[in-house]
Amino acid sequence: MKTDLKLTRDLRITFSVDTPDHGRVHVHSLPLARSIFETFVLELGETYSKVFGSYDPKHVAMTAPQMALPALRAVAKRMGTWDGAGGLEVGLINELARLTNVAHAGPGGWEQLPIHLAHQRGILDDDTHAEVLSSLVFFFLTLRVGPDVLREDTLRMASSARGWQYTSLGFTEYLASLPTSTPVASTTKKRSSVIG
């Protein structure tokens, strides 16, 4: 994965999380469209102010990814825009989930699922699912709401602390870049026991 990529608004985020029952899983998410930002600009702006209120960038990089989704939910509920067909839960969180895939080690190699199926099937428990979504909300807030001058530093610090990577790869190409999830068969020749 390239580490010298320019952090543009069309980058994808990838990271790994350790799950209680399924070991390490890999998350890959596409960026949300600008239209999502424009639809929920008031809620996102207020959430950004709450989550990024600290002047210490290290504090923001360490704590903000866990606070982003709960803060966004609280802001939207207070504004009356969380629930319903046009609400933030459907319009932003469900769209974020639609753009996010999970890879976990299965018997035949990496198995890929949309994040909502990984959650429904228990690959991501409730806490891990919420942690992943909150990290993705933080990433989106940083890319779309934050000023350009802070974006790169914030994402570099967060990625350093959390093992995040940013890529231009699609999910299939990202999976191909992962280490093999099944044991590789030995290719050493065995000595023949046939005599004569």
Label the predicted regions.
Residues 1-35, 42:
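Short N-terminal edge-element motif at the start of the domain
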Residues 34-196:
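Short, surface-exposed, charged amphipathic helix/loop patches that serve as local interaction elements
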